[in-house]
Amino acid sequence: MSSTTRKAGKYTDFTPDEIKEYLTRFRKAILDGKYTIAKGRKRRENMEFIEDYRINTKKEREILLGIQYDDFCYAVDNQKEEFAHEKLYIFCKSQELDYWGELETVDIYIKINMTQTKSGDDYTVVVSFHRRNKPIKYLFK
């Protein structure tokens, strides 16, 4: 199954309340265990980040549940043609993490794709979960 990519639009026309509502749904999916962090071959950066900071499932959940509306940056269209109807939401969360015994504050780049299951429940794929590696602007800070 091949997928074609396309140029993604960038969206910043959100209100704080819209992002808060999105995060309410996102948190419910996390608490219900209906999420995954992408760790495949193309997501090496996610895997290295998780390994470098020894982030276990409990810590993943803590970080994800701690995302606030003012951590929101922007949304983009899914670049894969067959998922063109999906929007990915980008957040950047500052978190103190243990790097082999040294505590350091890290800006974590988090890209979220929330979709629905056939039964209508939200399911979340955290596409990106790694150290921020480029400048970013927050929408509400």
Name what the model sees in each region.
Residues S2-F91:
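Compact soluble domain cores
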Residues I37-A38, V76, V106, V125-V127:
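Extended aliphatic helical segments
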Residues D107-Y109, N113-K141:
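Enriched for short, Lys/Arg-rich terminal
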Residues Y69-D121:
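Functional cores of ribonucleases/endoribonucleases
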Residues G40, N78, T105, Y138-F140:
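General "foldedness" signal
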Residues S2-S3, S94, S119, S128:
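Generic serine detector
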